[in-house]
Amino acid sequence: MGRKLCRGGLAVAACLIVAMAAACSSSSSTPASSSSASGSASPAASGAHGTLIVFGAGTLATPFTAEIAAFTKANPGVTVHSQFSASGDRVKAITQLHQPADVLGVADYSLIPKLMFPANATWYLGFVSNAITFAYTSHSKGASGLTADNWYKVLAEPGVRIGRSNPAADPSGYQTLQMLQLANGYYNKPDLSASVLKNSPASSVAETETSLIAALQSGQIDYLAIYTSTAQEEHLKYIPLPPQINLSDPTMAADYAKVSINAGSLGTLTAKPIIYGLTIPTSAPNAALGEKFISFVIGPQGQAIMRSNGFVVISPALANPQDKVPASIKPLTTQWPASGG
C-alpha cells in the first residue's frame, strides 16, 4: 500500500532551518488583487506615519494581509496600499511600468537580482521557504486510488484535468515544470513530465495558481500545482512529494540545479530551493517605512504570522549582499552563504 497522503501539516523537511543555520554558523486574465489598510488606534501611539505601498506574490496575499493588519495596529499612523499578483508581474510593474512600491515580496528570491539589479534594487533577503505540490479534493478524478507513490500515474490518466500557473510570469509555474523534470529522474520515468503535462493544456493555465483554487473546489479541474502553504490555508488535500523533487530542501540545491526550463520572457531558469525574497526598490517613495515593515515581517511577530500560514521561516533572514542592506534591517539578517543565493 502507498504512503498515506497529507491533509494539513506542511510536507517540508524540518532540516530546512537547521541547514540554513549550519550554512550561516500569480494567463494574464487574472488582475492583481489590491487593498488598503490603516490602523484604528490613536496615531499618538506610534511615531510611524505615512503611506506604505506593498507589492507581493499571489501566495503572499493571505500572510501579508495579516502582516499588514498587525503592522498598522502597532503603527496606527500608517496607511498601507497593497497589490498581489504573479511575482514576475509585480517585478515588471516596478521595472517596466515604473509603478511606485516601498516593499516587494516575491516567491523566488532570484527574480530580484536577475531582473532588478542594479538599477531597481541592490539587495534582497530570503525570509521564508515553501514546497511545490499538487492539491486536490475528494471528488478529483482518481483521488480514491491516489498515493504518494503513484501520483504521477494518476495525474497522467486520460480525462484528468490539471491546473497550474503561467511559467513565464509566476514562480510556481516554472517551479512546477522544474519539479516534474526532477521527477523524471527520481522515478526513472523519462516521459513522466510529458505524460502529466498533456493533461494541463493552455486552457487550464492561469497567471497565478491561487486564481484556480475556485476551479479546483468546484470540480472544473481535478488537480492544481500549488504551494503547500496555500494548500494548508485553503484546507485542501495535497500530495506529499519527496524533498528530492519538491524544491523544499536547501541541502539538495546541487541536485535541483541539474535541471532547468525555458520560462519565456524570464529566460532559462535553473531549479533551486524555493526561498521567498524581500527588497525595497531603489525608487521606493517611502523607503524608511518600507524598512520598518520588513523589520516587522522578519521579526518575531512577523515570523509567527508566516509560520501560522504554513511557511517555513528562515531565521535570521538571509541577506545578499548584507553590506547593502539598510542599517535598521541588518541586525535581523545574516550574510547569504556563498554557495547559496
PLM region spans:
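Bacterial N-terminal signal peptides that target proteins for export
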Residues: 1-13
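C-terminal motif of bacterial Sec signal peptides marking the signal peptidase cleavage site
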Residues: 19-23
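A short alpha-helix-loop-beta-strand transition element characteristic
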Residues: 124-127, 189
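Pocket-flanking alpha-helical
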Residues: 87-120, 213, 231-235
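Exported/periplasmic ABC-transporter solute-binding proteins
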Residues: 25-27, 31-69, 73, 79, ...
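Short, solvent-exposed loop/turn segments at the edges of secondary structure
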Residues: 129-130, 273
